[in-house]
């Protein structure tokens, strides 16, 4: 009995062993297949982060050397629109029939100062780099040596608004070239160097700017620097029209402000600069003087003398919205003037302007 029982146990053990061996053999053959399936699945599976993780979103998925590569794009929240001084004064509520994007506009006949169009033209606002036109007027009337070499120093670096400049500290240019790129390209360091190299330095130069403004009857105008970077440089459109007519009498200011581009030498090395006003390069326009300007507080600004239908006019646009809006407003004014009959402008009659609105 014992032998029979022992034989039965041994038989069961071998049977179990055979089952285990078979199971192991099956497992060994099955494992590679499962691994292959998993590997195959892995090849077709792209692990992505959350659609938006820490300000990133999936930009594209590409295949590189048989592997998927995920490229992400950083999300940048748009900055809220900056309220200009004109907006804060409520000027954006002023409407006009031409739907100008500028909060302030003035157009007058250059020959007799007849106002053809005005919109908030007596409100003093920041004028940004239009300031440089007064800088130019003071420089040319001071009769300083225009061939004198001026050096850009650390004092000319903008540490308030951190505006860019192609002129490095140590760059040397003639006074004429400094004035040229200040008017044509609105080069801030050049404008600063011009003021700093005036007899008495920057304080005396700013005082000369304000003295000239008083001489021209610019009662709403005040300057604090030669570049226009400060929001404290303010003027009304009516005052700027007076400045334009005075500056127009200076051939150097007319030429430098309306050149499309120019090559100037800095430390003996040629540098090419271009205009900030694309209209001067247009064959459809005849422009004799111009200056653009922009800082956040001022919006887009434009001062310009042009001939339209044989008539010389002064245009001033302040606090315009959009990078091209000031030149677009100039185009709207031009079409409006071209569409008017000469009699409708009351040229020389001393009557009310063709259009007037605002404060």
Could you describe each region identified by the protein language model?
Residues 218, 222, 228-359:
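Domain-terminus/edge residues, biased toward the C-terminal soluble/receptor-binding domains
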Residues 25-27, 168-169, 274, 333:
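Short, hinge-like loop/turn segments at secondary-structure boundaries
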Residues 1-101, 339-359:
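N-terminal secretory targeting signals
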Residues 16, 20-21, 126-131, 137, ...:
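Alpha-helix boundary/interfacial micro-motifs
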């Amino acid at each position: 009995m014992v032998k029979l029982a022992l034989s039965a146990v041994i038989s069961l053990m071998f049977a179990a062993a055979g089952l285990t061996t078979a199971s192991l053999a099956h497992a060994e053959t099955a494992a590679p297949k499962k691994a292959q399936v998993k590997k195959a699945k892995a090849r077709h599976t792209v692990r992505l982060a959350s659609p938006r993780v820490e300000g990133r979103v999936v930009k594209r998925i590409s295949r590189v050397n048989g592997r998927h590569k995920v490229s992400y794009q950083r999300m940048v929240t748009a900055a809220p629109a900056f309220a200009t001084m004109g907006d804060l004064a409520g000027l954006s509520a002023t409407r006009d029939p031409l739907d100008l994007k500028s909060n302030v506009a003035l157009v007058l006949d250059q020959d007799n100062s007849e106002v053809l169009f005005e919109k908030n033209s007596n409100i003093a606002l920041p004028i940004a780099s239009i300031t440089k036109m007064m800088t130019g007027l003071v420089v040319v009337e001071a009769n300083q040596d225009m061939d004198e070499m001026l050096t850009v120093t650390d004092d000319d670096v903008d540490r308030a608004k951190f505006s860019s400049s192609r002129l490095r500290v140590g760059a040397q240019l003639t006074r004429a070239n400094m004035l040229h790129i200040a008017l044509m390209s609105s080069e801030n360091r050049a404008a600063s160097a011009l003021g700093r190299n005036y007899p008495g330095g920057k304080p005396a130069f700013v005082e000369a700017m304000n003295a000239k403004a008083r001489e021209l009857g610019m009662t709403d105008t005040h300057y604090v620097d030669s570049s226009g970077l400060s929001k404290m440089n303010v003027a009304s459109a009516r005052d700027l029209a007076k400045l334009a007519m005075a500056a127009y009498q200076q051939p150097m200011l007319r030429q430098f402000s309306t050149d499309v581009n120019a090559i100037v030498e800095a430390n003996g090395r040629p540098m090419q600069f271009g205009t900030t006003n694309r209209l001067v390069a247009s064959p459809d326009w005849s422009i004799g003087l111009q200056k653009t300007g922009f800082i956040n507080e001022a919006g887009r600004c434009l001062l310009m003398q042009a001939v339209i239908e044989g008539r010389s006019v002064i245009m001033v646009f302040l606090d315009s919205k959009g990078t091209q809006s000031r030149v677009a407003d100039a185009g709207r004014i031009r079409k409006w003037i071209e569409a008017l009959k000469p009699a409708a402008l009351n040229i020389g009659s001393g009557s009310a302007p063709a259009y007037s609105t605002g404060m």
